[in-house]
């Protein structure tokens, strides 16, 4: 079994000052385009979410009839299109369904679908551990 360990990242919080969050620097790719991006590892997110600019960089295509709205915590709905991309975590690359946001103001989220069933993911002592 192999492990990839990411230290939590310290970030500013309006409520708590400094907090440590589970962020993993992962490679996301589509065809010949790839980018190293900091994803929040979010066990509460159904899908992996990427902002409009990243999907555009990856050459994802918009189809008006495929736009749907998703909603997380809070009342705001976000228009997205579901697409496939590859994510590499350590030495393992998997294809995942991503929700490509058609707005920019969304965080990069690594959600459960296609990810959590390919890895054992452990949140422990300010570290995120991926085992495969």
For each of these PLM feature ranges, what is it?
Residues 1-132:
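Pepsin/retropepsin-fold aspartyl endopeptidases
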